[in-house]
Swiss-Prot record:
This is GTPase Der. It comes from Stenotrophomonas maltophilia (strain K279a). It holds the Pfam family KH_dom-like. GTP 1 binds at residues 9-16, 57-61, 119-122. GO terms for molecular function: GTP binding; ribosome binding. GTPase that plays an essential role in the late steps of ribosome biogenesis. The keyword Nucleotide-binding applies. CDD domains: EngA1, EngA2. It comes from the Bacteria.
């Protein structure tokens, strides 16, 4: 277990900038707008082979107990309660505030080791700033400018001295056997509620307010002997509706999470059916070529008649991805979770299935004999051989002639044939078609001296007859 350092403070004092500087990443969203961070975000600060510690970025504590602000405060308090060291971050330019006073009073009740970290020191009179914050009674005050990486070395030296060798933090590992699952969907379909239900704790802020989740938060989980990484993402909307700069950053984070996951769980709201926004999210998953499971949330709230109507609508709107399994769930009450994870396993296994060249060529031969390509302008495309070219999604390269003339309907036929033959569930199948070139095209055959003599003897023999 790694030591854990928590960044705590009011909104917009630069906690996320400090987090990015310490972890040397851009994992935390940073913007001048207060309240960008809401959920806890964990990262690792790696100084050298021997000195690692976890850092947790928290949302700004705004002094409110209700709504989103209250939920953000509870997340920050949960992070502070489990930390081995708390960095109480304040703003050098704005000085002390009543909210800082409240936060400090609460931190002192925790009885956790705490350092005062004064950020945004650049462009200020440091002596005056120290004098103002001296009333907080810290024996050591650290000053930094995280945006300019000023003072970070002194901060790290102080942190290392105060941390225990073993801590309470658990690092996200790089276990290749851990299944990475991204929960995606439009805003307010229940992604955070579902992740919290799976984890059995309020790890993510769940609210009826659309756009509550702004960052992509990853949490490791062991369930029934299997290892997972759950990634809660911000809701995606059509580009024409994305206005705020913060939301645009959130969209980028979500797209990155889709690219990096192994299985995407697309969440739909059963009470609203499949909307244009849902189609936008589904398109992003298909573009990334990721394995897909569709989770239809709030199914328990429908009457029998509404369920029949919903089933008809789903089959109509999702008919172009018949290979993706659909699971009916309730994120709020936890029903359908076992079926959801079974579908995730099937999709993951199919997406990472390995193939031999001989078996895929046999499949291509059977597919070709069963249904040859149609004749186009007197010519037929020839499929000569195929070989596997990768996984997630399963990819096959087909070599032949006149493949540019191959119709899309025949390409879909090959996809469906391979999917059925190899029992591929929940994953797209990709085919790459390459036309072979004749290496002797344009070259004149030059005979050797021996071949020339043999040709002359043959010609004499023919003429002699």
């Amino acid at each position: 277990m790694l030591p854990l350092v928590a960044l705590v403070g009011r909104p917009n004092v630069g906690k996320s900038t400090i987090f990015n500087a310490l972890t040397r990443t851009r994992d935390a969203l940073v913007h001048d707008q207060p309240g960008v961070t809401r959920d806890r975000n964990y990262g690792v600060c790696r100084l050298d082979e021997d000195n690692h510690f976890l850092v947790v970025d928290t949302g700004g504590i705004a002094g409110e107990d209700e709504g989103l602000a209250g939920a953000t405060t509870r997340q920050a308090r949960a992070a502070a309660a489990e930390a081995d060291l708390i960095l109480f971050v304040v703003d050098a330019r704005e000085g002390t505030s009543a909210l800082d006073d409240e936060i400090l009073a609460w931190l002192r009740k925790l009885s956790r080791p705490t350092l005062l970290l004064i950020n945004k020191i650049d462009g200020t009179d440091e002596d005056s700033v120290r004098s103002e914050f001296a009333r907080y009674g810290f024996g050591e005050m650290l000053t930094v400018s995280a945006a300019h990486r000023q003072g970070l070395d002194d901060l790290l030296d102080e942190v290392i001295q105060r941390l225990p060798e073993e801590g309470s933090g658990e690092e996200l590992d790089n276990d290749p056997n851990r299944i990475r699952i991204a929960f995606v969907g439009r805003p307010n379909v229940g992604k955070s509620t579902l992740v919290n239900r799976i984890l059995g704790e309020e790890r993510m802020i769940a609210s009826d307010v659309p756009g509550t989740t702004r960052d992509s938060i990853a949490v490791d989980l062991e369930r029934d002997g299997r290892e997972y990484r759950l990634i809660d993402t911000a809701g995606l909307r059509r580009r024409s509706r994305v206005d705020e700069v913060v939301e645009k950053f959130s969209v980028v984070k979500t797209m990155q999470s889709i690219e990096q996951c192994q299985v995407a769980v697309l969440m739909l709201d059963a009470t609203e059916g499949v909307t244009d926004q849902d189609a936008t999210v589904l398109g992003a998953v298909l573009d990334a070529g990721r394995a897909l499971v569709i989770a239809i949330n709030k199914w328990d709230g429908l009457t029998e008649y509404q369920r029949e109507q919903a089933e008809t609508m789903l089959s109509l709107k999702l008919g172009f991805v018949p290979w993706a399994e659909s699971v009916r769930i309730s994120a709020k009450h936890g029903s359908g979770l076992r079926e959801l994870f079974r579908a995730v396993h099937r999709a993951h296994e199919s997406a990472n299935k390995t193939f031999t060249t001989s078996e895929v060529n046999k499949a291509l031969e059977v597919a070709y004999e069963t249904n040859p390509p149609p004749t186009i302008r007197g010519h037929v495309s020839k499929l000569r051989y195929v070989h596997p070219a990768g996984a997630n999604p399963p990819t096959f390269i087909v070599h032949g002639t006149r493949l540019k003339e191959l119709q899309e309907s025949y390409k879909r036929y090959l996809e469906n044939f391979f999917r059925k033959r190899f029992k591929l569930i929940g994953t797209p199948v990709s085919f790459i078609f390459r036309e072979g070139t004749n290496p002797y095209e344009g070259k004149k055959n030059v005979l050797t001296e021996r071949q020339v003599k043999a040709k002359r003897r043959l010609m004499k023999h023919v003429k002699g007859k």
